[in-house]
């Protein structure tokens, strides 16, 4: 049985990724305590996910490594906050979402388009790397930020006119799209080994 390491220290993200892979013939492992956090210096979500996976590969050379990076990109703000979604300023996700609302000001809804994006990178023990992406498009509301909802509390889905917080665990969110594609790649690889 192959060992699969989820390359994140974020418990919620680790649990979400694990749920998708638990039916596969792999032994899912969390990061070991001696593996340091990775500096996310990439210019894209794919680059950051790759950096995480490659960093863990140094400690787990025979494992399948799965890493993910995601965030919000607001068109009128030239893609901001993009790869810095969780770290463009100190504070909570709610405070960062409020800052996005502040930067958008009173722009009309036609100028408030945005996309949640996710990239999942899988590094296989044989050196193969596969990349999966997911996205949901929508608009940023006029606010206010719903307490405890972060960016999901200010994002309206294009096709549902529904706040993204309501689809956090739904099949159509950006992360689940990317993970489902990654599961397909994993199944494909497992059949060949």
From Swiss-Prot:
Cited SUPFAM superfamilies: ITPase-like (SSF52972)
EC numbers on record: 3.6.1.-
Gene Ontology, cellular component aspect: cytosol
Source taxon at top rank: Bacteria
A GO BP annotation: nucleoside triphosphate catabolic process
GO MF annotations, alphabetized: nucleoside triphosphate diphosphatase activity
Keywords, ordered alphabetically: Hydrolase
Family stated for the protein in its record: Belongs to the HAM1 NTPase family.
Protein name: Non-canonical purine NTP pyrophosphatase homolog
Provenance organism: Halalkalibacterium halodurans (strain ATCC BAA-125 / DSM 18197 / FERM 7344 / JCM 9153 / C-125)
């Amino acid at each position: 049985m192959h060992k699969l390491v989820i390359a994140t220290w974020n418990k919620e993200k680790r649990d979400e990724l694990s749920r998708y892979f638990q039916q596969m013939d792999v032994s899912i492992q969390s990061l070991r305590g001696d593996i340091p956090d990775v500096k996310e210096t990439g210019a894209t979500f794919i680059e950051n996910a790759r950096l995480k996976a490659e960093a863990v590969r140094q400690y787990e050379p025979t494992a399948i490594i799965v890493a993910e990076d995601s965030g919000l990109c607001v068109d009128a703000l030239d893609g901001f906050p993009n790869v810095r979604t969780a770290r463009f300023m100190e504070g909570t996700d709610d405070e960062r979402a409020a800052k996005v609302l502040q930067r958008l000001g009173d722009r009309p809804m036609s100028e408030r388009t945005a996309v949640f994006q996710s990239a999942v990178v899988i590094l296989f023990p044989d050196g193969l790397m596969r990349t999966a992406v997911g996205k949901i498009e929508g608009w940023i509301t006029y606010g206010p930020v719903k307490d405890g909802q972060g960016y999901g509390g200010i994002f309206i889905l294009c096709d549902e006119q529904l706040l993204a917080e309501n689809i956090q665990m739904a099949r159509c969110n950006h992360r689940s799209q990317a993970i489902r594609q990654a599961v397909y790649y994993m199944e494909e690889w497992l059949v060949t080994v």
